[in-house]
Amino acid sequence: MSNKSEAAILKNLEKLAVHNDPIDQKLYSQYDVKRGLRNANGTGVLVGLTRIGDVVGYELKDGQKIAIPGRLVYRGYNVEDLIKDADKNKQFGYEQCAYLLLFGELPNQAKLEAFSNYLGECRVLPANFTEDMIMKAPSNDIMNKMARGVLASYSYDDDPENRSVSNVIKQCIQLIARFSTLAAYGYQAKRRYYDNKSLFIHNPKPELSTAENFLRLIRSDKQYTRLEAEILDLALILHAEHGGGNNSSLTVHVVSSADTDTYSAMAAAVGSLKGRRHGGANIKVMEMMDDIKANVKDWTSEKEVGNYLKNIATKEAGDRSGLIYGMGHAIYTISDPREVLLKAKAKKLAKEKGFLEEFALYDLIEKLSPAIIQEVHHSDKKICANVDMYSGLVYSMLNIPRELFTPIFAISRIAGWSAHRIEEIVSGGRIYRPAYKNISKEREFVPLMDRK
């Protein structure tokens, strides 16, 4: 079939789909459909219970949302306390965070060392995996490559269908350990086969943290500073878990409830996170910032920056979506604790890397945006910057290319996904089966030879 013929066929099929699939938006209100599993007041529909993580941004009083400063809680502990403890002991904290999410308890020093050593031993991919599953089948999209890598791992597992808790824990720990390697090698394959650049394949070092190993694997000289590794470690901690209701974690629960294998569940979660509405938000922030920097002459002028932000909010500038990316969150109202913690460390990195002028622009946008959004939308809803406002800037200062931004999210969130899979199995939940109402009328069948 020629390309022209295929295009014509697909165009006709597209017309049918566009004509027959749309649903009158009024019907969603008529049938009280909780679109996106959201209630009318913006809160999420309660579909499950979890002990793993909690996202706190408001309190409910008489059915009304009352804004409060945001908190991110892992297994009952405020994440800010975990980070402070790691800083105090001059340790990287992601591994301790992963242990806590998986097993529900804070490890002592001996348990943490044993767990970190186990992760280190698991970072190396199976024999021939790199050559056969990554280099021989590169992808221009690293999240796509990671999903394929997860599914391919099934074939390298001696007992992939064993869904005992101990075996699932083993599978999850191996995936947590290997995600940074999968992402880094997928990136190197893309560089070689799609970007025509030099290929560097370094072996992970078992004694290094997840953050250190990742920086080592993506850089040709394998070098990084302590501050660089610390801020990446912080980003990994802050993205590791966000409650059971976020799209990718819910995906893990839904797919796991069907009693499938670990690799299928995790690949589905990667597919969810790959979506532009979920894992790609910090890239949208960076694209918006590129546009602002190109069109605003004086980055220090509140008037000039504010006027351009208003043009973005009124769909007269930027990508014409009307969104000031990096602002607002479904749950956080007064503050996103992840943004607060990452911003503080980002300023230190900006000073080291010579990015203070750019950091000040981000800070000004964060300051001006809430009032502009409220003015344009005639709303008094409280709006705060979210973690995506600064995460992209942090990765850029680390000289990490944008195609790795969402994979870093996955490297972090695999710990939370693993905890949710184990929780779903241990809790023995039923298969997810929500309702969909069919609104089509029944029609009289027309035999093939009688159709026009």
Question: Where does each model-flagged region fall?
Answer:
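Non-transmembrane, aqueous-exposed alpha-helical and coiled segments at domain scale
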Residues: M1-K452
